[in-house]
Amino acid sequence: MAPILIALVSLISYATTATKQTAPTKTESVAQSRDTSADLEAIGSVIAKYAKSIDSADTSLASQIWWDSPEVSFIHPLGHEHGFDQIKANVYTRLMGETFSERKLTPRDITIHVYGDAAWAEFYWEFNAKFRKDGKPIATHGRETQIYRKMQGNWRIIHVHYSGMPTTQPGQGL
């Protein structure tokens, strides 16, 4: 739990934010700007691999982007997974692999924030799939936050939280 807390504290404690939408501030050096740009690109690549890992229910690909630790977590409408073993078993194998015969996750409107060796991203997504049992299609839309930590030069996912889109009907979504 300590590494995740360190990453979360790092996210809060840094005074400057680098995102895909902002240019370097006057106080940033050119080297810092290049590092941040490279980090934004690397995290964008992690998000693309994440979507591909969901599309193919591929735990090997997931192993390249997740921190293999009992301290990572994944919150989703059907549960809360603790540790990469649970994420592989319950999200990738059971939910994605056994529930759906086809899957396509499309992230959009991605915003990435880098704070040293910690980062987070938020995005909206569209998920299209077919149920394995009867071939019926399903299309859902939602939003997601991912938290990352840079370890040995590589960005790794340490936490995911996703949910459906907000509801606007009275008495719902509370």
Q: Model regions: which residues?
A:
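A short acidic/glycine-rich loop-to-helix N-cap element
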Residues: R34, K133-A139, T167-Q172
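A solvent-exposed, acidic/Ser-Thr-rich amphipathic alpha-helical stretch
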Residues: E41-A42, T59-V114, Y124, A139
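A short hydrophobic beta-strand element
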Residues: D117-F127
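Beta-strand elements of well-folded, non-transmembrane domains
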Residues: F127-K133, Y148
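Short beta-strand segments enriched in hydrophobic/aromatic residues
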Residues: W66, W125-F127, H161-G164
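Short beta-strand edge/turn micro-motifs at domain boundaries
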Residues: T22-T25, W120, H141-T168
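Short, low-complexity N-terminal intrinsically disordered segments enriched in polar/charged residues
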Residues: T16-I65, G171-L174
